[in-house]
């Protein structure tokens, strides 16, 4: 499967809640995104022109969503249910859409300009 899905590691849990952590080499602007239940985002792919979209690196920090994807070269496709907290890496040339099952919050580890320069719809 070309999509990489990994839980976000738990550092500590106590009566206040949980502390999770992740590491990244990326710097600069990131996107904090809120989507309402029932909405669909994405419906595009990236060619890998932008470093920030090769791969697309996203952290679902709240909620539940379905990620539908299709490899444009092999034609392999699937739908994965994502339950926060989880990290998803989507390589270039993978068409994808994200359907919010509940209200969701996610962080994209790229800037808005990186995304717009390397986003293509079919």
Protein language model annotation of sequence segments:
Residues 20-23, 42-52, 69, 78-80, ...:
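Short histidine-centered beta-strand/loop micro-motifs
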Residues 1-32:
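A short, N-terminal "cap"/entry segment at the start of jelly-roll beta-barrel domains
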Residues 19, 43, 67-68, 88-90, ...:
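Short beta-strand His + acidic residue motifs that chelate non-heme Fe in jelly-roll/DSBH
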Residues 1-4, 13, 97-122:
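Double-stranded beta-helix
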Residues 12, 32-54:
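Conserved short histidine dyad/triad with adjacent acidic residue
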Residues 72-92:
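Short acidic-glycine-tyrosine-enriched beta hairpin
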Residues 53-70:
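Glycine- and acidic-residue-biased ligand/ion/polar-headgroup-sensing regions
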